[in-house]
Regions:
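Acidic, low-complexity/disordered segments
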Residues: 1-23, 27-29, 120-122, 131, ...
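Assembly/oligomerization scaffold segments
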Residues: 1-139, 176-182, 187-197, 202-204, ...
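Short beta-strand/loop turn elements enriched in aromatics
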Residues: 35-62, 258-294
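Short structured motifs
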Residues: 52-55, 106, 312, 393-397
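Charged- and aromatic-enriched interaction segments used to assemble
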Residues: 56, 95-98, 112-235, 263-265, ...
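Short, intrinsically disordered, charge-balanced linker/junction segments flanking boundaries
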Residues: 149, 408, 426-429
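Short beta-strands within extracellular/lumenal beta-sheet-rich domains
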Residues: 368, 388-402
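Extended extracellular/luminal ectodomain segments enriched in beta-structured repeat modules
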Residues: 401-411
Length: 429
């Protein structure tokens, strides 16, 4: 949660509130266009962000936040290329003073103009990391990887080297395996966040920030603060991770002592390929320790809104159908300017951990088709020659076993070196 005063937290949960939004647009040339609540087309503004997909908790997320807004401003849209938009939320406290919460810095990607309205769509600085990466010989700690991406893409880091090195695997020396699918600096951040056991996002100051999933609630959302809500009847929790070792072409499995939850598949992480087996086990064990804090109830709720909430914040819900003994986490949110705030936490059911999804079944079917189309030819030659005389001698013997249905054909070839015994014959003509 963005640091705010206790007076702000009390005011934002009150039955009524007085607030307004403001912002400014800074062009690439340094020209500043300020706007306030009256310049915003009612119902047009929104901010949406996420740290997971639409179905399950993820490690290594590097999602970009999106902002859209329509303004009654007379600005030439062609001057807004590479412009930045800053938004702020101002809430009146009980004392009568206003407290300001920055809502982020976004870079304009689209600017459309109608007769009276300027329509903007913008994304945060995460998109800057979509630049080609060619440092395949890179070696360093997680902070070194972050600093490399930060310098190359022009985005400041929110944390110091000491803060990153204090994290799980933060002080380990990492190296990029030559055989990898890294294309951009964003891919490097993805794999680095996996090793650290969390995700990256751009914070409200426009800096790259690493966050982990926690277990300490930052606030409670009461029933009177919710317009609608739905809660799952299960708790998402992870008790194992699996990682593919490219050198041995095997999937390595690491689990807690009681392994009865979901398994996080790390796939082929090029930063987890080098080192001894014990080193890989330690790295994956630290990732599992960070992941084991995930003990969340998936939910979806429309609330009166608290603009100070951030991705990764742990919440509790009470009242109605909510279980106040369980915790949950904000994995995505949408803030409507002048409207509601939608909060969501995704997660899979541990009871279905062994079940295959439709996509998994389709992939398995395709792999089976590929395997079915393979033709294998194996040639065997006897180690030594056989001498054949008047008695029967077995010269070909094949023992065959298959783990699946196959069509098999056997062909035998006997190369004979015949030596005839000379015999004297006579005949009369």
């Amino acid at each position: 949660m963005y640091p705010v005063s206790e007076a702000f937290l009390q005011a934002v949960q009150g039955n009524t509130r007085k607030y307004y939004w403001s912002g400014k647009i800074t062009t690439a040339g340094g020209v500043v266009h300020s706007f306030d609540q009256e310049d915003i087309v009612k119902g047009s503004g929104y901010i949406t962000a996420q740290c997971c997909g639409n179905s399950e908790i993820e490690l290594g997320a590097v999602y970009a936040a999106e902002m859209g807004i329509s303004l009654f401003l007379d600005i030439d849209r062609y001057t807004l290329e590479d412009a930045e938009v800053e938004l702020s939320y101002h809430l009146r406290l009980a004392s009568g003073a206003y407290e300001t919460v920055p809502m982020g810095i976004f870079e304009v990607s689209e600017a459309n103009r109608t007769v009276h309205v300027l329509e903007l769509k913008a994304y945060d600085r995460m998109l800057r990391f979509d630049r080609a990466f060619n440092g395949f010989e890179t070696i360093g700690t997680a902070y070194g990887m972050m600093a490399l991406c930060s310098t190359a893409c022009g985005v400041e880091l929110a944390q110091t080297q000491a803060e990153i090195e204090a994290l799980p695997n933060g002080s380990e020396l990492l190296s990029i395996y030559p055989e990898n699918d890294i294309e951009t600096y964003r891919d490097v951040l993805y794999f680095t966040a996996q090793v650290l056991g969390g995700f990256f996002c751009i914070n409200r100051a426009g800096k790259l920030e690493f966050r982990q999933y926690g277990e300490t609630p930052v606030m409670e959302i009461l029933q009177k603060h919710r317009f609608s809500s739905s809660f799952s009847d299960f708790v998402t929790r992870y008790t194992a991770v699996s990682s593919t070792n490219l050198r041995t072409q095997t999937s390595e499995y690491y689990a807690l002592e009681t392994d009865d939850g979901l398994t996080m598949n790390l796939g082929v992480n090029p930063l987890l390929q080098f080192g001894l087996e014990e080193t890989r086990a330690e790295l994956c064990g630290n990732i599992l320790d960070a992941l084991s804090k995930v003990n969340y109830v998936p939910f979806d709720s429309d609330t009166i809104g608290n603009p100070a909430l951030d991705l990764g914040d742990v919440l509790t819900f009470s009242g109605g159908q909510a279980d106040d003994q369980q915790i949950t986490c904000v994995t995505s949110f949408t803030v409507k300017i002048g409207g509601r705030q939608s909060l969501k936490c995704v997660g899979k059911n541990p009871r279905l951990s062994q079940a295959k999804s439709k996509s998994d079944k389709n992939i398995s079917g395709l792999l089976n088709q590929i395997e079915a189309g393979k033709i294998g030819i194996h040639t065997f030659t006897n180690a030594s020659e056989y001498s054949i005389g008047e008695t029967d001698v077995r010269i070909i013997s094949i023992e065959f076993a298959s783990k699946e249905e196959n069509h098999t054909q056997f062909f035998g070839q006997v190369v004979v070196d015949v030596a005839a015994d000379p015999a004297a014959r006579s005949a009369n003509a």
